[in-house]
Amino acid sequence: MRIGLYGGSFNPAHAGHLHVSRTALRRLRLDRVWWLVTPGNPLKDHGVLAPLDERVAQARALATDPRIAVTGFEGGIGSRYTADTLRWLVRRQPALHFVWIMGADSLGTFHRWRRFDEILSLMPVAVIDRPGYTLTAPSARAAQAFASARIQEADAPTLAIRPTPAWTFLHGPRSALSSTALRTR
């Protein structure tokens, strides 16, 4: 089974998250996408972060597609960093083929994530285009560091079964929605 892992604060979850998930399901030929609602992002301000249980409930109410599952399990395992969460999942589910999913806006700061290189060694990564990042994301520090591991967009359906490191950038229709913009309204 091929599972896309889409982590984030989901503060709040919105139609843009659904767009990214459906794009990944279709273009990567995934069976499921799991939304990993994080207890807190070490790189973001927690002052505006709604409680985890509220964000999980709101995300579940939005994600009515049966191929999308919402979980807040990171809080239960005491994980604070994506690399730790992904390592935990890979150890417990070795028969599953995971792909880490991220928006192109996150690729610009990916090199600041704790052990970002370990994430790329644990599973392939799919970067989904976002407005304003089409041209800048591929020149991000992490993208440059792993340029030789980038696969062609036409080969994206095979990403989940490729040896790591491997990543791709998926162009296409983009959603301009963002949780930050929704919170400031």
From Swiss-Prot:
GO terms for molecular function: ATP binding; nicotinate-nucleotide adenylyltransferase activity. Belongs to the NadD family. It catalyses: nicotinate beta-D-ribonucleotide + ATP + H(+) = deamido-NAD(+) + diphosphate. It comes from Methylorubrum extorquens (strain PA1) (Methylobacterium extorquens). Keywords: ATP-binding, NAD, Nucleotide-binding, Nucleotidyltransferase, Pyridine nucleotide biosynthesis, Transferase. It comes from the Bacteria. Pathway: Cofactor biosynthesis; NAD(+) biosynthesis; deamido-NAD(+) from nicotinate D-ribonucleotide: step 1/1. This is Probable nicotinate-nucleotide adenylyltransferase. NCBIfam families: nicotinate (nicotinamide) nucleotide adenylyltransferase, PRK00071.2-2, PRK00071.2-4. The lineage of its organism: Bacteria, Pseudomonadati, Pseudomonadota, Alphaproteobacteria, Hyphomicrobiales. Gene3D superfamilies: HUPs (3.40.50.620).
